[in-house]
C-alpha cells in the first residue's frame, strides 16, 4: 500500500480514539471548554447515558461567527499561540483537538453568540472532508454544544459502550470532580429530562464545606482535616480524612487537582499514601480532596492524551512538599505532647558556621550570640527548619502548620538558639597563620588532587582523604552530641533480630552522633541524621551501617564515626578550585592536627629541585 495522506475525517477519528473513550470523555472536554470561556453556569443534559444526546450549555463569552468554522477544525485553539504559552498553560484545554475529534464520531452542532453580536450562529461539520456549514440561529450570549448519536459511524467503538446506567455514572463522576474544582460555577446535570445533580455556586469559603458534603458525603465531611500549606511557589489546600476513622466507603474519595486541573497522578497519590502509612491498615487507602498550586512553568501537562497526568520538573520537591503538608495536619490531629524534659534545645544551623556541624577541640570558641527568633512564615506552614532552609529535593524545610499552642512552643524552642550561655571550653592558643595552613592552592590535578605551594615547597594533597578526615571530625561528638537533622521522609527498613539487637545496644551512641531512630517488631525507622549525611543515599548507607554494627561486639562513637566517614560518598566527583579552597579552610579550622602531622595518604611532597637539576644538566 503506498504512503498517502489520510482523509480529515479518518484522521480525526483516529485522534478521537485517544481523546473520546466514552460519553464521559465528551462531557469532560466540553465542560472544560465552557470553564475556559469564563462560564459561571453550565447545564449538562444527557439522554440514554450519553449515547443518544449530550448537550452542554453555558453562559460564557461565546465564539464569534468568523471563528466558528475554525472551532471545529483540528489544531485550532484560542488558548495558546507560541511555545512559551505551551510551557505555562493555565487553561484546561490547549490542543484544539476535542471538537474536531468529537464531531468526527458523532453529529455535533455548535451554536454560539458573543455579547457584541446581535444574533447567534450555528455550525456543524459533515461529509468526508468535514466541511463546516454556518447558519443563523436563536441563542443567548454563550455557547451550546449538542452531540447526537455518539459513535454512530464507528460501530466497533459503540459496541464497547456499557449500559446506560454505567455510562451515566461515569458522567456523574466527572461532574463531581469538576464541581470540586470550581466552587464558583453552578453545574446542573440532567438525565432523560430529570434533574439529577444541582451544584450551586458558592462565593464564600465557609460555604465550600456545604458543597464538599453534598459531593463527598457527610461521613467524609465529619472526618475531614483541613490543610493549608505553602512554601515558595507551592501551595497545598484541601481536606484529608482522618486515617484512624477511614472506612471502605471513604477510600473511594481520592480527588487531587493541579492548578485547577483534575489529576490521577501517581506521584501525588504516593506522597499522600506515605504520609498516612503509619495510621492506615494494609488494605486501606487514604481519602482526600487536595488542590496543589504550582508555577505553570514547573509542570508539564502535555504528557497524556486526556490530560489525566502531569510531569513535574522537580518531582522530588513536589512529592516531599505534599508529604510534609499532609503529615503535619495528621500529626496535629494526634494531639501528642512533645516531651520537653527529654529534648534539649537545638541550635539553628547556620551554613557559614562549620563548627556547628561537628566538633572542634582546637579552635577558639566563638562568642555567644543573642537568641534569634525563627523567621516568620508567610503561611502557617512556611517556617524553615534545621537545614538552613535549603530547598533541595532531599531535604525540604521542616515546618509544621497550625500546631496547637503547646506543640508550637516546643517547636519554636527547637528552632531558636538557646538563650543560656554555653559552657565555656578551654581556650586553646591562637593558631599560627603560617604553621597551621596547608598553603595556597595552585591548581587541581587529576580531578581529585590539589597542588599546593607553601613556604617555597610544592605538595600534592588528596582531596577525598581530606574530606574523609573532615567528615570524621564533624561526626565525632565533643562535650555535646552532634546536632541531629530531622528527615523530611523517615527511612523505614526491615531488620533481622541480630541487627535489631545491635541497634538497641548502640542507640545511645548513635544518638550522640545525631542518628535517631525508632524500632518495632521487624522494622527500624530512621528519624534524623547528622548534617553531613543529609545529602547521602541513606537507603544504601544506613543498611550498610546496620550490618557493620551487627558484626561488632563492642561499640565506640569514634569507631562508628570513622566507619561512616570512610563510607560516605563524596559530594564532588570532580573538584574545582573553589571547592578545594573551601575544604582546606574547613580542615585547617576543624582539624589543625592534620596540618602539623599529616597522616599517610594525605600529602605527598613534589621534588622540584630534582626536576630543575635534571633540566639544567640537559
From Swiss-Prot:
Residue stretches of biased makeup (Gly residues): 382-392
Disordered: annotated span: 367-402
Molecular function per GO: ATP binding; ATP hydrolysis activity; ATP-dependent DNA damage sensor activity; mismatched DNA binding
Xref: Pfam families: DNA_mis_repair, HATPase_c_3, MutL_C
PROSITE patterns (alphabetical): DNA_MISMATCH_REPAIR_1
SUPFAM superfamilies registered for this protein in UniProt: ATPase domain of HSP90 chaperone/DNA topoisomerase II/histidine kinase (SSF55874), DNA mismatch repair protein MutL (SSF118116), Ribosomal protein S5 domain 2-like (SSF54211)
Keywords, in A-Z order: DNA damage, DNA repair
Biased composition annotated in UniProt, kind: Low complexity: 367-378
Any one annotated GO CC term: mismatch repair complex
Highest taxon listed in the record's lineage: Bacteria
GO annotation, biological process: mismatch repair
Role this protein plays: This protein is involved in the repair of mismatches in DNA. It is required for dam-dependent methyl-directed DNA mismatch repair. May act as a 'molecular matchmaker', a protein that promotes the formation of a stable complex between two or more DNA-binding proteins in an ATP-dependent manner without itself being part of a final effector complex.
Family: Belongs to the DNA mismatch repair MutL/HexB family.
Name listed for the protein in its UniProt record: DNA mismatch repair protein MutL
Native organism: Salmonella paratyphi C (strain RKS4594)
Recorded name of the encoding gene: mutL
